[in-house]
Protein backbone atom coordinates (compact mmCIF):
# COMPACT_ATOMS: atom_id res chain seq x y z
CA UNK A 1 0.00 0.00 0.00
CA UNK A 2 1.00 3.62 -0.36
CA UNK A 3 3.11 5.01 2.50
CA UNK A 4 1.58 7.41 5.02
CA UNK A 5 1.66 10.81 3.39
CA UNK A 6 1.04 12.65 6.65
CA UNK A 7 4.65 13.79 6.55
CA UNK A 8 3.92 15.47 3.22
CA UNK A 9 1.16 17.56 4.77
CA UNK A 10 2.02 20.85 6.43
CA UNK A 11 1.53 20.98 10.21
Swiss-Prot record:
Keywords: Neuropeptide, Secreted
GO CC terms: extracellular region
Membrane-crossing segments per the record: none
UniProt keyword Secreted present: yes
Subcellular location: Secreted
Main location: secreted
Any one GO BP annotation for this protein: neuropeptide signaling pathway
Keyword DNA damage: no
Function: FMRFamides and FMRFamide-like peptides are neuropeptides.
Family named by the database record: Belongs to the FARP (FMRF amide related peptide) family.
Designated name of the protein: Extended FMRFamide-10
Amino acid sequence: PAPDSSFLRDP
